């Protein structure tokens, strides 16, 4: 945690201040002072490193990947008195994170100081953001003055766990695509990659002692269209979609992430979400006669509302089957040997217990172990898994359902069903990662559903930006940090994944790094727009949904449909039409709620800034808008 030094910085820099001329840094640093003047990078840049910097060669490689490849600047290692870019190791104040850094730029050059290699690395990420967006280009940029503003920046993270979860089970992402994901994370000072490696739709990691897990569980029939509406697979159809990571792939990803100061958290999701495992070992459910297949995207789970759900197929491991624990011991032995991180995530979420209630084996287990209900049955399972994981020298983490029926000793809780579970777990002195779906589920809609790819729920950028990883009521001593989750049921491609992730991942990055008092929505929006330019250069996809209007619909005078609109981003003008023609800035501007005129069947709206279109043209049929009226 960042302590006293930060509060002094608030007094120096002001809270939530932002000048248009200041560099657009995300996440916003604790303290940043700018002065007149800039340092232009020379054609030959001399660099020096303090003795003891362990990853000097990697830092040189990183500098070369942009400065030499993109800017054409040659690099030369020299003594510090000849260097225009110096990397120095310092002693960290007791109140500061070892990930802290200081960055100074003046007429003599650039100085990056930090108590650790991680801090030096984060200083470099800030350095890149001080350069023009063209530094992110994929090819050489000529005739550019690569200048950096004179500044003094002091920075440190708010929390230690700054995570993103990537679901590689529902849709598979290749090793190289995961590396790109890691690069994008690192650029915004994330330091935990949570890999959701297993689910009903795929088993994505090699377990050498259990080859059937990937031979059977990693592949399914290929489908195109809307997830949840696919037809059921024929057992005989070719299983052409899927893939998995070999253990050598995992080692390569771990090394790649570690160079960028990112730890990888593996998740093996049990006892529910286990259909891919059961396709390989069907006798491990409480309904062993089921003809299991890896799920291909057809709907078998149902959520009727009120937080309740049920399944058409038993996709759970059976807590009463001793062979389950033997198999899990084998799996976690190999997982623990692969991943250096202290935690292993065992899932524990969305276990439909109706199948257990019908099982004679479960009834015998309850009688033998004096278990009162199905929550205690799940707790029995979780505690046994916790002991298996502990026997491998690791700590267990799970989604907040692992609290049901009694929390296992020492277990970490990832709080996704709001903040309540995480707050309660922290008061019980259990480590907590805050990941509430109401702020951090970046697979939800981020704009009007009529303009977005199909998904569910709603999480607009501004709401994401309100995320506080240490919510009121939590014991901050036990809150490790926070993370965003990118579930991939509906994400068929990397471009779609990027669209859902950015810019909401900017918002979470700032929420987990920057002091709460430094966050400012209007400033954040301005900075995002600069980072959109950086992403354009890098070829990274992103969503511009924040520019689109937010609509609410109601009935007035019994039958007339009234539409109210507002913007998420300030200083936009909304223009609209009912005449089947796209509205330009000469069409009526929205000022107050509008009523569909008689005979009109479609509303068209678009946002403008300074007379130029900035949002998407939204085509809103009356029939669709009527569906939003609450009766």
Identify the role of each PLM range:
Residues 1-24:
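Bacterial Sec-dependent N-terminal signal peptides
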Residues 20-159, 496, 511-538:
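Contiguous, structured surface segment used for ligand recognition
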Residues 94-326, 330-343, 384, 388, ...:
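Feature activates predominantly on carbohydrate-active enzymes
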Residues 305-411, 416-427:
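Active-site neighborhood of glycoside hydrolase catalytic domains
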Residues 395-411, 417-562:
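Flexible, acidic glycine-rich loops studded with aromatic residues
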Residues 25-38, 48, 515, 519-631:
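Short, compositionally stereotyped local motifs that mark structural "simplifiers"
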């Amino acid at each position: 945690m960042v302590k006293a030094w930060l509060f002094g910085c608030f007094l120096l820099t002001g809270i939530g201040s932002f000048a248009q001329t200041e560099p657009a840094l995300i996440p916003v640093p604790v303290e940043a002072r700018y002065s007149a003047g800039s340092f232009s990078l020379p054609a030959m840049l001399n660099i020096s490193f303090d003795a003891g910097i362990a990853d000097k060669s990697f830092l040189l490689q990183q500098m070369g990947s942009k400065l030499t490849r993109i800017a054409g600047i040659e690099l030369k290692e020299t003594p510090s008195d000849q260097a225009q870019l110096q990397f120095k190791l310092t002693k960290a104040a007791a109140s500061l994170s070892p990930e802290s850094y200081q960055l100074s730029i003046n007429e003599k050059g650039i100085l990056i100081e930090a108590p650790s290699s991680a801090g030096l690395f984060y200083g470099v990420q800030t350095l890149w953001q001080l350069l023009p967006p063209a530094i992110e280009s994929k090819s050489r940029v000529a005739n550019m003055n690569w200048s950096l503003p004179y500044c003094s920046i002091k920075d440190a993270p708010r929390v230690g766990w700054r995570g993103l979860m990537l679901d590689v089970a529902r849709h598979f992402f290749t090793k190289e695509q995961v590396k790109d994901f890691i690069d994008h994370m690192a650029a915004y000072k994330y330091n935990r990659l949570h890999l959701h490696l297993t689910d009903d739709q795929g088993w994505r990691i090699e377990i050498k002692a259990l080859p059937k897990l990937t031979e059977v569980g990693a592949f399914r029939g290929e489908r195109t269209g809307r997830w949840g509406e696919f037809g059921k697979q024929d057992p005989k159809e070719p299983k052409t979609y899927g893939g998995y990571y070999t253990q050598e792939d995992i080692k390569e990803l771990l090394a790649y992430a570690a160079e960028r100061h990112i730890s990888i958290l593996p998740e093996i999701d049990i006892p529910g979400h286990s259909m891919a495992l059961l396709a390989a070992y069907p006798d491990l459910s409480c309904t062993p006669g089921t003809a299991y297949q890896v799920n291909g995207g057809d709907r078998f789970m149902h959520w009727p509302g009120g937080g309740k759900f049920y399944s058409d197929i038993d996709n759970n491991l059976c807590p009463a089957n001793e062979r389950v624990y033997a198999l899990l011991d084998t799996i976690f032995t190999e997982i623990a040997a692969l991943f250096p991180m202290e935690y292993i995530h065992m899932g524990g979420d969305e276990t439909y217990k109706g199948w257990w209630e019908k099982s004679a084996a479960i009834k015998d287990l309850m009688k033998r172990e004096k278990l009162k209900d199905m929550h205690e049955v799940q707790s029995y399972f979780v505690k046994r898994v916790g002991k298996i994981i502990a026997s491998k020298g690791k700590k267990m983490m799970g989604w907040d359902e692992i609290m049901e029926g009694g929390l296992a000793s020492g277990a970490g809780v990832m709080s996704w069903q709001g903040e309540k579970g995480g707050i309660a777990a922290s008061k019980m002195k259990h480590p907590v990662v805050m990941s509430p779906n109401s702020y951090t589920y970046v697979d939800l809609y981020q704009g009007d559903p009529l303009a977005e790819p199909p998904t569910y729920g709603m999480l607009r950028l501004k709401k994401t930006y309100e995320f506080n990883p240490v919510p009121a009521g939590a014991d901050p001593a036990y809150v490790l940090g926070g993370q965003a989750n990118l579930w991939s049921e509906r994400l068929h491609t990397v471009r779609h994944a990027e669209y859902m992730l950015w810019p909401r991942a900017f918002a979470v990055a700032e929420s987990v790094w920057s002091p709460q008092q430094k966050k400012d929505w209007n400033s954040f929006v301005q900075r995002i727009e600069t980072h959109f330019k950086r992403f354009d250069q890098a070829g990274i996809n992103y969503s511009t949904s924040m520019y689109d209007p937010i609509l609410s619909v109601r009935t007035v005078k019994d039958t007339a449909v009234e539409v109210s609109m507002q913007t998420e981003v300030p200083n936009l003008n909304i223009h609209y039409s009912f005449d089947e023609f796209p509205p330009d800035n000469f069409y009526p501007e929205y000022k107050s709620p509008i009523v569909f005129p008689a005979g009109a069947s479609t509303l068209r709206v678009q946002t403008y800034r300074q007379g130029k279109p900035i949002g998407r043209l939204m085509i809103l049929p009356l029939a669709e808008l009527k569906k939003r009226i609450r009766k």
